[in-house]
């Protein structure tokens, strides 16, 4: 049989909904039925906050999955940073999103599903950073014995900063610079890391002195409260710090990852201040004690040397005994030397007498005569060489003179030209720009002429100075 076009009475009596109507009806039913709920699940699809500041991800278990959203205002209040795969307990309102007909939970509060989950995440992160070498012992730096400037990264309010400042004042007052940060909350980790890097970026000798030592401090709290100091950004900043760093997070039983990256870990903020500086009174007492011991040691050493010197002096022979034998030897040698000199002179005189008769100046005279015969020839050669040299110099001088005359402007003047100079002696290249009444000098080949620029650009000869009375010869100057 063909299908019938008729509908059942029940279908004809059913209310007709639009898509929007049924979607909003379901939304209302879900919200009124469930209201606020607590859901335990594993975070999936987490990519951090959206550009709007809201955070979208999913919650799942081994059988189902649901969408979740944290609005921007609530996300900033979280005490820890959500991560992919973390098991959490979400508290919020169950609702639907009509645009896609999906239900979701709008989270007001998020917490780890037990301390065990956070500890597992912490251990996994510790192993990862340790494998990178951030916790290696060779990276640790020694703390300065007495830092001039100490930088403290902590909350500006509360007991922690007061305890540190009070302890430093008691032990050894130092210049302290406090970089205020939030020590828990979503922005805490970024602020702490920025403070560490900010201190390291300061220049030595700048307006604000660069610290010689850093203290990162926070009071006690739960693992969630201290979680900012387990974030990678903080641990890496501490490991990269060029300034030695002391971590003092929580109480002695609390351990955070920054403790592994720091150069020293203090169980409390007060203990960090004690590590930072010695006790001034103890140093002064130690200096006085060592000074007294040094003086006593010097006195004992001087007395010991004096005793040894006295013993050595008593063992020395008398001066007269030391020089008596050498003096006797000297006298004997002096007598022998005088006699030896006389005998040597007599021997030399006798030898000279024997050879005196054999001495003759004939060989020397013959050599002088032979050398004298060659003098005229040498003189002629010298004369010819000097004559040639003088002739060469004369030719060179004549050539240089002609070349100099060819470059000299006097040759141009001889062809009828003249050189015009101003009062300072500088040549004038054009008449334009010369003012009337200006004095100029015109140089010809044989003489010079002083002139004055007349109005209109002509040159008028300058009047000669009046002659002196008496008719005598005037001054050439």
Swiss-Prot record:
Its EC number is 3.1.11.6. Residues 456-477 are annotated as: Disordered. It catalyses: Exonucleolytic cleavage in either 5'- to 3'- or 3'- to 5'-direction to yield nucleoside 5'-phosphates. GO terms for molecular function: exodeoxyribonuclease VII activity; nucleic acid binding. GO terms for cellular component: cytoplasm; exodeoxyribonuclease VII complex. Keywords: Cytoplasm, Exonuclease, Hydrolase, Nuclease. It is found in: Cytoplasm. It holds the Pfam family Exonuc_VII_L. It comes from the Bacteria. GO terms for biological process: DNA catabolic process. Bidirectionally degrades single-stranded DNA into large acid-insoluble oligonucleotides, which are then degraded further into small acid-soluble oligonucleotides. Belongs to the XseA family. PANTHER family: EXODEOXYRIBONUCLEASE 7 LARGE SUBUNIT. Heterooligomer composed of large and small subunits. HAMAP family: Exonuc_7_L. This is Exodeoxyribonuclease 7 large subunit. It comes from Parvibaculum lavamentivorans (strain DS-1 / DSM 13023 / NCIMB 13966). The gene is xseA.
